[in-house]
Amino acid sequence: MSHAMMALMIDDAKDEPVTPCYRIRLEDFVVTLSIGAYEHERSRPQRVRIDLEMAIDQDVSAIGDRLSAVVSYDGLLDRIERVASSRHINLLETLALEVADICFGDARVRRVAVSVKKLDIFDGRAVPGIHLDVARPGSRSAAPRC
């Protein structure tokens, strides 16, 4: 990383208050759903891999080894599967936004990064996908610059 990039990062961070947080990751979650904008994609379900990371606005030292004190990823998987099976979705971007909305259902989640990839569409030649990084509306943690 160049010194100029580091200086920009430091400059951006100095005005933002530091609050304790930790991150939860869910990786390699594969769901089968009806997705795709093209007619030939509507005829059969496709496998999609979802990876996500949530920044949790909570001091991990205050959790006290209690499941009730943390954001549960178990229920999160069930909610994502329900959305995926509820209807046809045209775009990966739409699915990623809906996954982010599910994550923001817990008030402690302040930022979500979601990657969604179609696993079977190009016969193994390539894996198309998108990455979405979004902050909770009104959060002090602004979304990154693209």
Placement of each model-derived feature along the sequence:
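N-terminal, polar/charged subdomain of small-to-medium soluble alpha/beta proteins
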Residues: S2-C146
